[in-house]
Amino acid sequence: YQSCCGTTLCFGCICAVYDTGGPSGGLCPFCRTPAITSHEEFVERNKKRAEGGDAGATFQLGRLYSRGRRGLPQDYGKAIELWLRAGELGSASANQNIGACYYNGQGVERDDRKARCYDELAAMRGTVKARHNLGLFEYTAGNTERAVKHWMVGAGAGFDNSLDGVRRHSFEEGLATKDDFEKALRSHKEASDEMKSDQRDACAAANF
């Protein structure tokens, strides 16, 4: 996440930038702002963008507090507060992270119902991991048909765990048809192929 302009770089782009000797002149490859030189500067840039209503920056601040990174103390309560704000601003990832906190009891009392509610919101906003989690909730509740539907969506978006869910929890247990699995396999491959690039392949090969 580029705290200067709010742009998010994939690992392939990051590798491409550093493969050419790093950002030209120490500048952001997108907005040309000078690169940060300290944790304090990174945090301050994020805070400034968050104060201006930037959902991405607000989400990133929450991540920093949840992990105790960039000189900030680990504080799940503060992280959730920021993610709630980011969710109001439209961040699906913030919704999903709050759901994870409720599921794991991090910073809040464990509550599967609330965890599911936040995963549902995140899934409706397009977060594939949250969609996969809904499949797990349904499978645990014995609603295998619904679980498979969620995992089919996740597999179609290229999410490996969802494809494994269709295979391991459904097809191999006789709870899904061969056609279901083959359809999931095809859609997963199509999505994965669309996301491929020479830069991402090089990044993976370098174990970046």
Describe each model-derived feature in a short phrase.
Residues 58-68, 72, 97-104, 108, ...:
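Hydrophobic face of amphipathic alpha-helices that form TPR/SEL1-like repeat modules
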Residues 1-2, 10, 28-31:
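Short cysteine-rich clusters marking metal-coordination/redox-active sites
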Residues 4-24:
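Cys/His-coordinated zinc-finger cores
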Residues 76, 112, 144, 178-181:
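TPR-repeat structural position
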Residues 169-208:
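Terminal, low-structured helical/coil segments at or just beyond the last alpha-helical repeat
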Residues 56, 93, 129, 161-163:
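Start-of-helix register in tetratricopeptide repeats
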